[in-house]
């Protein structure tokens, strides 16, 4: 009886710690040659040039400092085009939780500025929108935004 209980406890323990880690809806594709602040500014400027509205900018570093905590450099910019996002939400309303689009800019442990993009293909898969033209355009747009941001002038 004791062996059976111990075996059950071991199985429960193993099942808890061997579960697959959930896949993130972000990916790191770009290292900026510019400083953190310059990279944030360049992203904002690129969005402005493309007439893409910025809905919010979250300076998580500043928010952490306000409560006497240190976070390092982390900012999230929320942006998008209702002309594009609305079409996607008409097909799958629940995808609205993923929109508007976001880009995360942070400094890694090697003191490099990273640009982290939403993994549009993962989102497409999660909402059964693979191979949708709008999804492909969003992915192309995000990559173009990052590439223009890190391009040498």
What are these regions (language model features)?
Residues 1-4:
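Positively charged n-region of N-terminal signal peptides that target proteins for export
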Residues 10-18:
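Hydrophobic h-region of N-terminal signal peptides that target proteins for export
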Residues 19-52:
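Terminal, regulation- and interaction-focused segments at domain boundaries
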Residues 33-38, 55, 129-136:
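Soluble non-cytosolic domains of exported or imported proteins
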Residues 39, 43, 60, 138-141:
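Stable alpha-helical elements in mature extracytoplasmic
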Residues 48, 57-104:
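Compact, glycine-rich, soluble single-domain proteins
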Residues 103-128:
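Beta-strand/loop substructures that line and gate deep hydrophobic ligand-binding cavities in soluble
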Residues 121-153:
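C-terminal partner/receptor-binding element of secreted or periplasmic proteins
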């Amino acid at each position: 009886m004791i062996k059976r209980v111990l075996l059950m406890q071991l199985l429960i323990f193993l099942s808890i710690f061997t579960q697959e880690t959930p896949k993130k809806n972000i990916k790191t594709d770009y290292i900026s040659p510019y400083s953190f602040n310059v990279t944030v500014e360049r992203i904002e400027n690129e969005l402005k040039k493309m007439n893409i509205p910025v809905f919010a900018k979250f300076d998580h570093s500043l928010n952490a400092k306000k409560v006497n905590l240190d976070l390092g450099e982390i900012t999230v910019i929320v942006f998008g085009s209702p002309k594009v996002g609305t079409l996607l939400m008409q097909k799958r309303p629940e995808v609205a939780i993923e929109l508007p689009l976001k880009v995360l800019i942070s400094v890694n442990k090697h003191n490099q500025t990273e640009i982290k993009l939403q993994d549009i293909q993962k989102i497409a898969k999660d909402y059964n929108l693979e191979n949708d033209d709008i999804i492909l355009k969003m992915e192309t747009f995000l990559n173009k935004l990052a590439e223009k941001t890190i391009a040498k002038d």
